[in-house]
Every structure is written in C-alpha cells, then in structure tokens.
A protein has these predicted regions:
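ADP-ribose/adenylate-binding Rossmann-like module
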Residues: 79, 90-108
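Helix N-cap at the beta1-alpha1 junction of Rossmann-like dinucleotide-binding domains, i.e.
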Residues: 35-37, 105
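Conserved Rossmann-fold cofactor-binding substructure of NAD(P)-dependent oxidoreductases
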Residues: 54-70, 79
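Residues in the short beta-alpha loop(s) of Rossmann-like NAD(P)-binding domains
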Residues: 9, 34-35
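C-terminal helical cap and adjacent loop that interface with cofactors, partners, or active-site loops
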Residues: 248-324
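Active-site-lining helix/loop region of Rossmann-like oxidoreductase modules
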Residues: 6, 145-266
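N-terminal Rossmann NAD(P)H-binding glycine-rich loop of SDR-like oxidoreductase domains
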Residues: 3-22
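Rossmann-fold NAD(P)-binding glycine/threonine-rich loop
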Residues: 102-124
Length: 324
C-alpha cells in the first residue's frame, strides 16, 4: 500500500514515519512537510521505500497533486484548529481514507460537514488518533467501563480526559503552542493520574506536567502570561520550547500518560518512549488503507480498535494499560 504522511518532520510525524517505514505492508511512504529539507533527510535516513515532497497544507490546492494512487493519508500536522478541517476536506475530495492526529475537538457543525463529504466520497476517516484525543477514547470505551454489574456500574457522568507529559521529552512547537494557548486554570489531579501540576482546558480535559520547573512555568502562563493575551501565550509557547531542556523531573517520570477518570475509577496508558500517539496514527492509517470494512464517513476510533487490539498495540510499543 501507498501512504502519505503529512507533517512528517514534526515530533509525532517523525515517530510515525519510523513506524510506517518498518512495515512490510507499506510499499511506499511519502513524507510531506513544509520544510522539504527535513523531509528529505528523514526519508533518506529511513528506507528506500520513502519519498519526500513539500506542501503547505493551509492551501487547499497543495494536497491534490500528492494524492494520485494513494491508499491512505496520515496527518500529524498541527495546530489542528488551523489545518485539520482543510486537510480532511481535501482528502475527501480526492476519495482518500484519512487519519488525523486531532489535538483538539472538532466543532459539531464541522464534524457533520466532514462526515458528509467522506460519505459522499465513499471512504472512511478517523479524527483524533493521538494521545488525547485518541488513546483517551480507547481507554474510556474499552477499559474504564466494563459494565459488569454492581461491582463496576456504568459511569454516571462523562469521564475526565487528561494528558500528562514531560516537556523535556514530549511534543513539538505546535503541541506546546496549543497547550500554552489552551490552559485556563489550575485543576485537581484526576484519579489514577501521575502526580504533578494539572491545568484545565476549555473542553473540560486536563493537561498535566511534572512538579517543579514545568509546573511553575505552566502556572505562570495561566497567571501572568494570560493577562498579555494572544501575544503573551505565543511567547510562552516559544519559551517552553526553548527552555524545556532545563526542566528536571523526578526519576521514573514517564514521557507521557493519557488517561480517563470518573469518580475513583480510572484507566491510563503509560508511554515510556513518547511514540504511542504516533503508533496509533500509523496503525489507523494502515487499517483504513486496507479497508477491512466498507463503512464510510467519520468512524469512531473505538470501532476500529477493540480492547485487546488496543492493549496489544500499547505493548508492542513498550507501553502498558493500567486500570483501577
């Protein structure tokens, strides 16, 4: 199969490129990025099956020229609020199954529009194939609520989603920018989550970081930088990127943890390598390319991966699912 990977030179894109290039069922992998030099270097370092191309995904006419003969598109482009809808509509117009990292929630109106164009094109798409959203949805669907009667009754309220990460080892500029722009206030630690400092996001989810300099820096963003508006938060994102190498953290801190919690019940996946979101994106794109089912439109991620399949994917990438 032939797969196009958008945002290939970014943090998640690079990890996804490594994983896809190692798969026997991927015969050709096209690494696409605005910085073609980085895409070219990565392609040459990985495998002869890799090609490279440049595209500005913010321009609707840039993508169609790359989609001829393609079986699926995997998009690791961020920030998703700026680019995701345009990417999805372009891929649907080309009749190409598409998986996106989706670092955020697509508005309901946009979701209906995107679902409609993919249905009209007769192909499927999945949005939110990273850590949050992505693994958080798999955890909520398959691990948090077993529905086994009085010992584990269904949750009375939606689960709280969270992403805990090490700023020194996880995420690129687009991700840190979304964190800096999104966090609104300090929040409590969700049940079963790693200890640290947590902050609320507008959609009700939470972002967590280790205690110490990382927690202090995000607290400053919520307090002082927020008063400076958009400019202050843009500066804060750049500052996070520049200084994250000097943010020590407790021994044993995982690179990233995605989790869900309701009351005292929880499910989380611990990612010691920082590539689990990329692994989910890559696996989703391959499954969409193979088209084991003929369902079209936007597909819920938990319908594509059962609980056992999700856990096996985690284990293959050095991660583990923990419930309680």
């Amino acid at each position: 199969m032939k797969i196009v990977l958008l945002g290939a030179a970014g943090f998640t894109g690079r990890a996804a490129a490594v994983l896809l290039s190692r798969r026997d069922d991927v015969g050709e992998l096209i690494l696409v990025d605005y910085d073609i030099r980085d895409a070219k270097r990565l392609a040459k370092a990985l495998s002869p099956k890799c090609r490279w191309a440049m595209a500005d995904v913010g321009k609707p006419l840039e993508l169609p020229r790359l989609l001829a003969g393609i079986d699926a598109v995997a998009s690791a482009v961020g920030p998703c609020a700026e680019y995701e809808k345009a990417i999805l509509l372009s891929c649907a117009a080309g009749g190409i199954p598409t998986a996106t990292i989706g670092e955020g929630t697509i508005p309901a109106e946009d979701r209906r529009e995107i679902d409609g164009v993919f249905r009209d094109a007769g192909v499927p798409a999945v949005v939110g194939c990273g850590m949050m959203p992505g693994w958080t949805e798999l955890l909520a669907a398959h691990f948090l609520d077993a529905g086994d009667g009085a010992m584990n009754p269904p949750a009375a309220a939606p689960a709280t989603r969270y992403l805990f990460f090490s700023p020194a080892r996880f995420g690129g500029y687009a991700f840190l920018r979304e964190v800096a722009k999104g966090i609104t206030s300090a929040a409590t630690v969700p049940a079963g989550a790693p200890s640290g400092n947590y902050f609320a996001m507008p959609d009700g989810s939470r972002i967590g970081v280790p205690e110490g300099k990382a927690g202090t820096r995000l607290g400053w963003i919520v307090g002082t930088a927020a008063k400076l508006g958009v400019v202050g938060k843009e500066f804060s994102a750049a500052l996070l990127l520049w200084t994250r190498g000097g943010m020590p953290e407790p021994a044993g801190t995982p690179v990233a943890v995605a989790g869900v919690a309701t009351g005292d019940r929880f499910a989380r996946v611990e990612d010691p390598r920082g590539n689990l979101g990329a692994a989910l994106l890559a696996e989703t794109a391959v499954r969409l390319a193979a088209r084991p089912r003929k369902t079209t439109g936007l597909l819920p991620l938990p319908e594509l991966f059962g609980g056992q399949e999700a856990e096996e994917l985690a284990v293959r990438n050095g991660a583990r699912v923990v419930t309680g």
